[in-house]
C-alpha cells in the first residue's frame, strides 16, 4: 500500500487529498505526477522518522523528476536525512547539488553553514585552531548568503556573525 494511503493524522490526510486532486487536474505528464507522488511519500516517511523509506522514495523521485527546481528540493531533503543520520559529508554533497540547481535555497545554505560550524567546533576541541578558523569562515560565508536571501531568518546565525565581528 502506498504511503499516501496509510496516513493516520488529519493534516497528512488533508495534504494527501489536496495533492491527489492537484495531481489529477494539473496538466502534467504521468512521469511528473509519479515523481511528485514519490516525493510526497518521501516527505511523509521522513516526517515519521522512516528515513530508509524516505530515501527510497526520494531516489525514485530523482529518477523521474526533470525540472531542476523540483530536483533541488528532492536533493535538499536527501541532504536533511543524511544530516540527521550524522553523515555530514554525504549531506554536504546533496546540499551542494541542490544549490547547483537552485541557488536561492537559503535552507541549504544554512544547513551547510551548520555543518561547517559543527566541524569547526570539533576542530577547536582537538586544538586544531587553523582548521577551525577555516571552517568558521566557511560557515560565516554560507550564513551570510542565507541571510542575504532571507534577512529575517537565521537569527541565531546573525547573532553569531555579529559576535564574531567583535572578536
Swiss-Prot record:
Essential for the assembly of the photosystem I (PSI) complex. May act as a chaperone-like factor to guide the assembly of the PSI subunits. Keywords: Chloroplast, Membrane, Photosynthesis, Plastid, Repeat, Thylakoid, TPR repeat. It is a peripheral membrane protein. InterPro entries: PSI_Ycf3_assembly (IPR022818), TPR-like_helical_dom_sf (IPR011990), TPR_rpt (IPR019734). PROSITE patterns: TPR, TPR_REGION. TPR repeats lie at residues 35-68, 72-105, 120-153. This is Photosystem I assembly protein Ycf3. SUPFAM superfamilies: TPR-like. GO terms for biological process: photosynthesis. It is found in: Plastid, Chloroplast thylakoid membrane. The gene is ycf3. The keyword Thylakoid applies. Its main location: plastid. It comes from Tupiella akineta. Belongs to the Ycf3 family. One of its GO terms (cellular component) is chloroplast thylakoid membrane. The keyword Plastid applies.
Amino acid at each position: 500500500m502506498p504511503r499516501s494511503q496509510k496516513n493516520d493524522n488529519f493534516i497528512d490526510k488533508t495534504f494527501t487529498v489536496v495533492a491527489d486532486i492537484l495531481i489529477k487536474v494539473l496538466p502534467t505528464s504521468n512521469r511528473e505526477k509519479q515523481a511528485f507522488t514519490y516525493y510526497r511519500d518521501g516527505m511523509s516517511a521522513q516526517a515519521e522518522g522512516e528515513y530508509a523509506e524516505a530515501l527510497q522514495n526520494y531516489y525514485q523521485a530523482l529518477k523521474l523528476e526533470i525540472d531542476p527546481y523540483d530536483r533541488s528540493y528532492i536533493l535538499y531533503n536527501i541532504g536533511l536525512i543524511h544530516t540527521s543520520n550524522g553523515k555530514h559529508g554525504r549531506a554536504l554533497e546533496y546540499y551542494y547539488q541542490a544549490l547547483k540547481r537552485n541557488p536561492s535555497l537559503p535552507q541549504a545554505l544554512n544547513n551547510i553553514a551548520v555543518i561547517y560550524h559543527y566541524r569547526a567546533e570539533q576542530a577547536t576541541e582537538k586544538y586544531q585552531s587553523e582548521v577551525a578558523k577555516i571552517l568558521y569562515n566557511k560557515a560565516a560565508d554560507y550564513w551570510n548568503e542565507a541571510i542575504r536571501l532571507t534577512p529575517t531568518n537565521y537569527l541565531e546565525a546573525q547573532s553569531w556573525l555579529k559576535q564574531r565581528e567583535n572578536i
